[in-house]
Amino acid sequence: MVVTVEDGRAVKVNGDPDHPPTHGALCTKVSRYAERTYHEGRVLHPLRRVGAKGSGRFERVGWDEALSDIAARLTAIAGPGGANAEAIVPYSYAGTMGLLQGESMAARFFNRLGASRLDRTICSSAGGEALAATYGAKIGMHVEHYAESRLIVIWGSNSITSNLHFWTYAQQAKRAGAKLICIDPRRTETAEKCHEHIALLPGTDGALALGVMHELIVNDWLDHDYIARHTEGWPALRERALAWPPERAAATCGIEAEAVRSLARDYGTTRPAAIRLNYGMQRVRGGGNAARLIAILPCLVGAWRDRAGGLLLSSSGWFRTAIDAAALQRPDLLGTRRPRTINMSTIGDDLLRETGELLADGSRFGPRIEALVVYNSNPVAVAPQSGKVVGGFAREDLFTVVLEHFMTDTADLADYVLPATTQLEHLDLQISYGHTYALINEAAVAPLGEARPNTGIFRALAAKMGFDEPCFGDSDEDLARIAFKPAARGGFDFADLRAQGWRKLAIADAPFAEGGFATPSGKCLIDSPGLGVPDYLPNYESAASTPELAARFPLAMISPPERNFLNSTFVNVVSLRGIEGEPVLEIDAGDAAARGIVSGQKVRIFNDRGEIECKAVVGPRARPGVVNGLGVWWRKLAPDRRNGNELTHQRLTDIGRAPSFYDCLVEVEPASAHRPR
């Protein structure tokens, strides 16, 4: 990203044409980053709540006063010797996407404090842990090599809106004669540009993968040599797949059997063949197993032998040997303490739990949560079952500190809101989950108002808490210099990174042509320790698994992000919200007609957990039996002050303890038909 600065103000944001994987392209949302930075709603000074929780009444205070009070209150909650420090919970995710402004000084602070640990599961942990269980790490093919593929299967990814740089390479391949197949319940912008679209039911991706395997076996489209030398556990999965003929897979997926046969034929007979997998498909009960089944497919046909063959879900695991996470986060500051772990995806339930409450697994909850420190996240908008999340954050006895750019739904319920810098105002280091380049993010302009980087806020708070370890004196540049291991140990030299702006990892062109996966044996683990052989798991909520529930709520709902939002980020940018208009629900014409719904009409979407209202859009983007509730809108910016997470639940995926956002049954009716009881 290249920022044009005039008189100390960022006036334009462009892509860097010299950056190899992106070639100067920016998506619409990031191209408006200057508008976001100078938004009239920026929080530029520390704020303290003076009214009731959620009243929106705050007063401006100085940094010293705010930090002193926060430190005093956290110290009081932690108790003598920090005995009750687990009652304090950090809550963060990927807001800055950076190594420094993410988990460096913040991690040091909470390790030293002995606070509860956070299981950061809200986005990708089901697929990520599934990939690690199969390949040994979150690793895959080079994104640049898709340009040379002859078949590209885009599975669970609206790449035009969420992975623009991959899409550029896919288009190059298409122009050279490659076939593109999109697998997605929704007829996305990407699906419209592919040669074929398989619109399966949400949560049935594992069944489709097993049906493809069945056809690979019976037609002998297998690379027996690659399977024998570079996989473990194939016989058991082979037996399982043979029980999934196309007819069974198709019936489960809600598609035609010929679609399964055709996909298997294309995949089994085309070289090089590549899969671009993304995280939408793993946000259901069986998402981890489905990701494992899909990740095994390239091994069965020997796709990894070609540099333009294989699979990419995430490349972030390639950086695992380059980053010195211990130097950044200092887990040694915990000493002998072993704090409990809170799953960020069940924060709605956990904020309402009492001390020692018996949990479903037979364990005890531990101390009631008394304080939350939120940074790089907006949980009131993005966490599942938001009715419970709001109820927890609204507790008057909960002390909440939020580091933010804006008064988000979460900030509205805080006791203190501390102004944080944006990407244009601080130093950071970035790695990628879509390519293999590390980048440096230099500050382009001085911080606005009294905004401080996350690192600076936690550094100052540590001083107020009396944490005198030398590591809390590290500057951001000090952190940047130790973030990566030396080049001789697989990392990067900071001076080189700063001089060039980016550095590429040294990874083989065809990394698994001869096996060499990151597992102990170097083989793809079809039978993975602790997980066994993957299988199809039906959704928590579906006609097959919960017929009585489905009779009341017959429509499956998925909630992918709006094209011009990054989950809840950018929702308050006026120009982008102007493009999106208002929250909508996409619904199939037949499903709409059966309910007396016409396009543009206000509808009510509901289940036992809650309800929302928005505008219906009737058309082909939704397949029969599925509605698409696009998000993630801030509740306060939606017409009914709610969003789709009012309807989602907190049950977790099979692998990775992740939320199953897309495993959700609802009913829809005209808003005018509802009469409050």
Annotate the PLM regions.
Residues 212, 232-353:
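Active-site phosphate/pyrophosphate-binding segments
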Residues 118, 223-224, 260, 274-275, ...:
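Acidic/polar loop patches that form or flank catalytic/metal-binding clefts of enzymes
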Residues 1-221, 256, 375, 637-677:
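N-terminal export/assembly segments and adjacent metallocofactor-ligating motifs
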Residues 49-63, 79, 83, 219-257, ...:
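N-terminal leader/propeptide and maturation segments of large enzyme subunits in energy/redox metabolism
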Residues 103-171, 176-183, 206-210, 296-413, ...:
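Extended redox/cofactor-interaction regions of prokaryotic respiratory oxidoreductases
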Residues 448, 454-500, 573-586, 590-677:
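Long, contiguous, secondary-structure-rich segments that constitute the structural scaffold
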Residues 192-200, 421-424, 436-448:
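Short beta-alpha connecting loops at secondary-structure transitions
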Residues 66-88, 142-150, 240, 261-274, ...:
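Glycine-rich phosphate/diphosphate-binding loops that line cofactor/substrate pockets in enzymes
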